[in-house]
Amino acid sequence: MVQAGEYLTIVGGCNDCHTENWTASEGKVDPSDRMAGMKTGFRGSWGTVYGKNLRIIVQRMSEDRWVKVLSTADSGDGRPPMPWWNTAKMNERDLRAMYRYVKSLGPKANGIPRGLPAGKEPAGPYISLTPVEPKANP
């Protein structure tokens, strides 16, 4: 089940936001660094959020709670760009496999910044998710 969970986190795009340098390295990140969160923020109209360190979260979250959170976005912090609408469509077995994979990695501290409200400038790097309208041609 752990192997299935690893596979699902890869094809589900979880590493894109929850693993530092995943996208820049085209997925060539040491497995010991996966799912420890990202220090690069995602900024939009809601403010700036950071991919959470799932390895720390699963240490204090039960498997049943994980399934509920990913099935219903009942985390109290379901802000974009987390695609709750996708994880809510996953079956329970797959969600449990993902939990077991992340849990198998063990805890790893990574110093992820706290999210910021709209209008507050982040101190570190971020990816802008604000749509930009093209300029009209004269």
Spans of features found by a protein language model:
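A bilobed periplasmic-binding-protein/Venus flytrap-type ligand-binding module shared by bacterial periplasmic
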Residues: 55-56
